[in-house]
């Protein structure tokens, strides 16, 4: 059972209230080749009378691939889909944090344009989130963090953003653990619980990891980085985890997660896919 815990000082930096989830909370995943075990993709369907639906968004990880979220958010803004809360995983936590401030796709694009390179990630986060508190956000925000010492997953959702987010973005191949914490990639139940507790009635997963289609994020299946992405993606896209819609953006396998110099290519290649899939989803929900 999920528990909402009030926490005191989190690692001497974060004074926050967190949704804590233990290993036993993570859904059991039964391997199968049956595609009916996955969330339905956005397909044309009769218009549902659910225009009052309130959407919670999970921004999955993917390093530079998360720049594709700019185009998705612009389409969400275009169709005026009501977003009530957001959760970010790995680099998706940065996008979610910026978006939660003013629910603006243009602001996300502007802040991402300030990124110089992975070696400057710490200064970048301090710069764009300086003096930004979760209490001042327009919609609730959380990011997924796994503490390696106590093997516990948290939804960090209270405190200063520049202090919270570093605990949520480390991943193999790019960043070392931050204060014994890395991005929690598999605790979908914790993310869904937080979004629903924040008022969401429909959960959307934004996925820029094409490993599910046999196109890994790195060139070799033997790499630990690629094994990490495939494992996390296999959990994210299962139907039994409470996700209602999945927006898949298929980006060239040549653009690996750590190739931040290819941000423009990600933006260009994701635009038509974002337009097509969001048009279908908006129609499905009556927008």
Stretches with model-predicted labels:
Residues 17-89, 98-287:
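Patatin-like phospholipase
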Residues 4-13:
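Sec-dependent N-terminal signal peptides
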Residues 92-93:
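Catalytic nucleophile loop
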């Amino acid at each position: 059972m999920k528990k909402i815990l009030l926490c005191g000082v989190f690692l001497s930096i974060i004074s926050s209230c967190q949704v804590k989830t233990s290993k036993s909370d993570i859904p059991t995943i039964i391997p199968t080749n049956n595609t009916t075990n996955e969330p339905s993709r956005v397909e044309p369907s009769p218009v549902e009378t659910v225009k009052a639906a309130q959407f919670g968004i999970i921004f999955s990880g993917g390093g530079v691939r998360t720049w594709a979220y700019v185009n998705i958010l612009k389409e969400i803004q275009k169709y005026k889909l009501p977003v009530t809360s957001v959760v970010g995983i790995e680099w998706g936590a940065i996008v979610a944090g910026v978006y939660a401030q003013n629910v603006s796709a243009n602001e996300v694009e502007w802040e991402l344009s300030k990124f110089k390179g992975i070696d400057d990630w710490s200064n970048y986060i301090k710069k764009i989130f300086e003096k930004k508190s979760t209490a001042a956000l327009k919609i609730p925000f959380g990011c997924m963090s796994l503490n390696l010492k106590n093997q516990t997953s948290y939804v960090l959702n209270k405190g200063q953003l520049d202090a919270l987010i570093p605990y949520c973005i480390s991943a193999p191949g790019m960043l070392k653990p931050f204060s014994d914490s890395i991005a929690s990639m598999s605790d979908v139940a914790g993310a869904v619980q937080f979004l629903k507790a924040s008022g969401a009635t429909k959960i959307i997963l934004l996925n820029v990891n094409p490993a599910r289609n046999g196109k890994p994020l790195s060139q070799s299946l033997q790499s630990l980085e690629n094994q990490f992405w495939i494992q996390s993606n296999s959990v994210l896209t299962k139907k039994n985890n409470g996700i209602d819609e999945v927006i898949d953006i298929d980006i060239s396998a040549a653009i690996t997660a750590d190739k931040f110099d290819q941000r423009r290519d990600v933006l260009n290649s994701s635009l038509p896919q974002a337009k097509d899939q969001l048009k279908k989803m908006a129609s499905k929900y009556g927008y």
